[in-house]
Design a protein with these regions (language model features):
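Auxiliary, metal-adjacent structural segments of Zn-dependent hydrolase domains
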Residues: 1-82
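Sec/Tat-exported extracytoplasmic proteins
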Residues: 52-59, 105-106, 110-114, 153-157, ...
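A structural motif
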Residues: 75-79, 109-124
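Short pre-active-site segment immediately N-terminal to the catalytic Zn-binding motif
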Residues: 84-101
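Active-site recognition of the HExxH zinc-binding catalytic motif
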Residues: 96-115, 146
Length: 270
């Protein structure tokens, strides 16, 4: 385990806990024996495991272990790991930036190797007016990905948590870096739940009555929209928020008129 206090890798007989997350992700949490008892170590593991689990899958894909020590020392990323010092964590929690810090460190662990020196990223760096922070500017290869990913996440997926002026500043400062991240098709579960395509079981179209009937496989407690299009590009909702009726859901409605062809699709909302 790397420990920032001696600034070295140290062999500890650590307390080990397994954190399992949706999507078959499992992370081993290794807690320094200085916490003395398995109960005290478990408290620390349970303190951080849920927060780590709220990170998007893209940031956890290379995380295999978490190291937890006492001490007021910076967190760390890399080595297929997240490094936590608990007194520093207390400060991050007081400042309201624990999750933001873990996003930064997990970016090192899961993104740096594939992106920090890629042609696309370097081209985006060169095309943008400036770096998003002095830390990124002073460490363009080591810190720019982690610094920029955090603000990209805020702008694209949590804009309600930043001011309009800050959002505009980020977009003006790093438009090409933001576009680079946009193009990556990152797995953002659980921040974004992937759209599910229901399996159609039956479809009937009655041109005499000008109505249609749809039946599809559904999931308990989900909601569904039935949409229509005349060109497979522009879609409009025919029926919205249809509650699941169990394993199978069905609906019928009048056909839109005035078209020589029409397409339907069913979308799960939640």
């Amino acid at each position: 385990m790397f420990d920032r206090r001696p600034a070295a890798f140290v062999t500890y007989h650590a307390f080990l806990f397994n954190a399992s997350y949706l999507g078959d992700k499992s992370i081993e949490i290794q807690v320094n024996p200085e916490f003395e008892t398995v109960e005290a170590a478990r408290v620390e593991a349970l303190r951080f495991a849920p927060v780590i689990g709220r990170l998007p899958n893209v940031l956890l894909k290379e995380v295999e272990t978490v190291w937890i020590h006492k001490g007021n020392n910076p967190f760390g990323g890399g080595n297929n790991n997240l490094l936590i010092h608990t007194e520093q964590a207390d400060d991050y929690i007081s400042d309201g930036i624990l999750e933001e810090t873990l996003v930064h460190e997990a970016s090192h662990t899961s993104l740096d190797a594939d992106h920090a020196e890629s042609e696309g990223w370097i081209a985006a760096q060169n095309a943008d007016p400036d770096f998003i922070s002095t830390y990124a500017r002073d460490n363009p290869t080591r810190e720019d990905i982690a610094e920029t990913f955090l603000v990209w996440l805020a702008v694209r997926h949590r804009p309600d948590r930043i001011s309009d002026s800050l959002k505009q500043t980020i977009e003006a400062t790093n438009p090409n870096r933001l576009a680079y991240f946009d193009e990556q098709d990152f797995d953002f579960f659980p921040i974004l739940i992937p759209e599910k395509t229901p399996k159609l079981k039956e479809f009937n179209l009655n041109l005499n009555r000008l109505d249609f009937y749809l039946k599809w496989e559904s999931r308990f407690a989900s909601l569904y929209d039935v949409e229509s299009s005349i060109n497979l590009e522009d879609w409009s909702v025919l029926e919205g928020g249809i509650p699941s009726q169990g394993d199978i859901t069905e609906t019928s409605d009048e056909l839109p008129t005035g078209f020589d062809r029409i397409f339907f699709r069913i979308k799960e909302k939640r």
